[in-house]
């Protein structure tokens, strides 16, 4: 009987531990991952606003460079590479949601013309597969196959992200034409400053919500601070909460102004966007060009041969 109770107790403890661990993982992952390009899906039907601004900039407030490389022209129903480059100093460390320092992750959103989409695995060459590695791309929406997102992924390994893209064929898709098309890209490195719900992360500056005298700074047991500010005009106490991982710039007894920074800026990342152009080329036009160039070359050859023949005739006449 006692053995049965012991086994039952052990089973309950294991179940409880697994449940708690799972909850901690979900909460931590949500905190760390929020505000990456893939999470814009939750709040925006289209990642590119009418102004041309990509919505990831709403959460990643610092402006950083991003670049995209695509071929100038592609043929219908062919696979090509779109390489997104997200450069940054690999030595940098960012503040994580738990307040510790860690490596930067990166993410990207690629907005292709209608009809262009992620290439199916059986169409991707071994060379491109090697560049992709273990990356897993997703459509922004099930009905928007031309918009792809990736991230967060380790920045030290994937500061260059290769998207395998399948070009459409106007012969089978009447909505596609042989034209020049724009491609838009957005890329970030590091965590955002604002979560999708509008709240601040611990990767940004915290400012004073009122002016006055700092009467008390309480260091919280799990990290972070509670700063008590006494409003000089009415004596009202205001408590500003500072999350863990941030460095204070103020001290007790100090007089501060409204919106004065209470912490240093921990953000070392940022977001950038760019664009490129690609031409969907008609194979018949290419064949026509090749035929024209071949004709020119043949004409030049015949002209040279004719000239040599004429020179021989002239030379023979002079000998007579």
Swiss-Prot record:
Entry keyword annotation includes Heme: yes
Entry's cofactor comment: Binds 1 heme group covalently.
GO biological process, one term: photosynthesis
Residue stretches spanning the membrane: 286-306
InterPro entries per record: Cyt-f_TM, Cyt_f, Cyt_f_lg_dom, Cyt_f_lg_dom_sf, Rudment_hybrid_motif
Entry's Gene Ontology molecular function annotations: electron transfer activity; heme binding; iron ion binding
Pfam families according to UniProt: Apocytochr_F_C (PF01333), Apocytochr_F_N (PF16639)
The protein's required cofactors: heme
Keywords: Chloroplast, Electron transport, Heme, Iron, Membrane, Metal-binding, Photosynthesis, Plastid, Signal, Thylakoid, Transmembrane, Transmembrane helix, Transport
Main location (coarse class): plastid
Any one annotated GO CC term: chloroplast thylakoid membrane
Compartments reported by the entry: Plastid, Chloroplast thylakoid membrane
Keyword Signal: yes
Sites where the protein binds heme: 36, 56, 59-60
Top-rank taxon, per record: Eukaryota
Functional note: Component of the cytochrome b6-f complex, which mediates electron transfer between photosystem II (PSII) and photosystem I (PSI), cyclic electron flow around PSI, and state transitions.
Family statement drawn from the similarity comment of this UniProt entry: Belongs to the cytochrome f family.
Record's subunit section: The 4 large subunits of the cytochrome b6-f complex are cytochrome b6, subunit IV (17 kDa polypeptide, petD), cytochrome f and the Rieske protein, while the 4 small subunits are PetG, PetL, PetM and PetN. The complex functions as a dimer.
Name of the protein in question: Cytochrome f
Species name: Olimarabidopsis pumila (Dwarf rocket)
């Amino acid at each position: 009987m006692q053995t049965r109770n012991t086994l039952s107790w052990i089973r309950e403890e294991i179940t409880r531990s697994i449940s708690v661990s799972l909850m901690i993982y979900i909460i931590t992952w949500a905190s760390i991952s929020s505000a990456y390009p893939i999470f814009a899906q939750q709040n925006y039907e289209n990642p590119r606003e009418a102004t041309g601004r990509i919505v990831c900039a709403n959460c990643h407030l610092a402006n950083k460079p991003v670049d995209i490389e695509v071929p100038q022209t592609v043929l219908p129903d062919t696979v090509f590479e779109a390489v997104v480059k997200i450069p940054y100093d690999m030595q940098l460390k960012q503040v994580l949601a738990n307040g510790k320092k860690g490596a930067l992750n990166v993410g990207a959103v690629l907005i292709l013309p209608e009809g262009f989409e992620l290439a199916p695995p059986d169409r991707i060459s071994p060379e491109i597969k090697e560049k992709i590695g273990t990356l897993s791309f997703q459509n922004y929406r099930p009905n928007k196959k031309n918009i792809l997102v990736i991230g967060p992924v380790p920045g030290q390994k994937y500061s260059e992200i290769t998207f395998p893209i399948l070009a459409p064929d106007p012969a089978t898709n009447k909505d596609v034409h042989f034209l020049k098309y724009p491609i838009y890209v957005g890329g970030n490195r590091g965590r955002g400053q604002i979560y999708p719900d509008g709240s601040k992360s611990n990767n940004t500056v915290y400012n004073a919500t009122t002016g006055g005298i700092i009467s008390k700074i309480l260091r919280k047991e799990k990290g972070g601070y509670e700063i008590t500010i006494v409003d000089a005009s009415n004596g009202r106490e205001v408590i500003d909460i500072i999350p863990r991982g941030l460095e204070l710039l103020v001290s007790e007894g100090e007089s501060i102004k409204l919106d004065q920074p209470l912490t240093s800026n921990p953000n070392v990342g940022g977001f950038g966007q760019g664009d490129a152009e690609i031409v969907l080329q008609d194979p018949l036009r290419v064949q026509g060009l090749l035929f024209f160039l071949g004709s020119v070359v043949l004409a030049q050859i015949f002209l040279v041969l004719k000239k040599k023949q004429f020179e021989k005739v002239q030379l023979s006449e002079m000998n007579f």
